[in-house]
Amino acid sequence: MAFSDLTSRTVRLYDNWIKDADPRVEDWLLMSSPLPQTIILGFYVYFVTSLGPKLMENRKPFELKKVMITYNFSIVLFSVYMFYEFIMSGWGTGYSFRCDIVDYSQSPTALRMVRTCWLYYFSKFIELLDTIFFILRKKNSQVTFLHVFHHTIMPWTWWFGVKFAAGGLGTFHAFLNTAVHVVMYSYYGLCALGPDYQKYLWWKKYLTSLQLIQFVLITIHISQFFFMEDCKYQFPVFQYIIMSYGCIFLLLFLHFWYRAYTKGQRLPKTVKHGICKNKDH
């Protein structure tokens, strides 16, 4: 009886909560409920931390050079497109970089922002292949807590962002992240091309710095919200989530930076047989 009451209360709570969702995305892929993505991400974590390494234990690593080249440069093109769409749907056409509220109208610009937010959300599932490729290539040491946590928490939290607040100041970190990914995946793509392209990778040592700058800018931008008394942003809870996200990843990347460059435990490695040896993000 107690379980039945708990279930009923949970259903009522969910129904009351979901009524505030954005109706524009109700019928979009993966947007009806958080359950499908939770199942996908749960299996992802299980595969990359347990099942995958076991399946590959007595197998030779896959040779994925051509696949990696195609994948990385495809992500570059996709990221360029999303960056452009974020600019054209708000960040370059009217957003103030301060108190930018969500536009829930059916205007072309508002719908363009919603579509761009969903594309960014969906791109996070495509990027799960980063870890899958590590497993298939038997690069298990690259499957760090930072890597798995980042690839899991981003799509899961972004479902709620798209479902309730697709636009406004809460999308700044996505806008910035697409630009960073253009640089990062360009490096990975060039790296995958092989040793002949090493001369074009002199800037690899700046990748971690670029990500640190990204999280500093995200934290600074979102911190403004807490000092603006008249900001009418519709879902303040997302600002606390983004603030936590920025601080957590800033600390994790600072730890990585210290371990890799100060203590010298994990310096970036060059390519071997045309495949990148280091891919933390």
From Swiss-Prot:
It is an enzyme of class 2 (transferase). The modification N-acetylalanine is found at residue 2. Residues 49-66, 137-142, 195-206, 258-281 are cytoplasmic. It catalyses: a very-long-chain acyl-CoA + malonyl-CoA + H(+) = a very-long-chain 3-oxoacyl-CoA + CO2 + CoA; eicosanoyl-CoA + malonyl-CoA + H(+) = 3-oxodocosanoyl-CoA + CO2 + CoA; (5Z,8Z,11Z,14Z)-eicosatetraenoyl-CoA + malonyl-CoA + H(+) = (7Z,10Z,13Z,16Z)-3-oxodocosatetraenoyl-CoA + CO2 + CoA; (6Z,9Z,12Z)-octadecatrienoyl-CoA + malonyl-CoA + H(+) = (8Z,11Z,14Z)-3-oxoeicosatrienoyl-CoA + CO2 + CoA. GO terms for cellular component: endoplasmic reticulum; endoplasmic reticulum membrane. It is found in: Endoplasmic reticulum membrane. Residues 2-27, 88-115, 163-171, 228-236 are lumenal. 3-oxoeicosanoyl-CoA binds at residues 124, 137, 139, 142, 147, 187, 204, 208, 211, 266. Its main location: endoplasmic reticulum. Its EC number is 2.3.1.199. The active site is at 150 (nucleophile). Pathway: Lipid metabolism; fatty acid biosynthesis. Signal peptide: none annotated. A motif (Di-lysine motif) lies at residues 277-281. Homodimer. Interacts with TECR. Catalyzes the first and rate-limiting reaction of the four reactions that constitute the long-chain fatty acids elongation cycle. This endoplasmic reticulum-bound enzymatic process allows the addition of 2 carbons to the chain of long- and very long-chain fatty acids (VLCFAs) per cycle. Condensing enzyme with higher activity toward C18 acyl-CoAs, especially C18:3(n-3) acyl-CoAs and C18:3(n-6)-CoAs. Also active toward C20:4-, C18:0-, C18:1-, C18:2- and C16:0-CoAs, and weakly toward C20:0-CoA. Little or no activity toward C22:0-, C24:0-, or C26:0-CoAs. This is Very long chain fatty acid elongase 7.
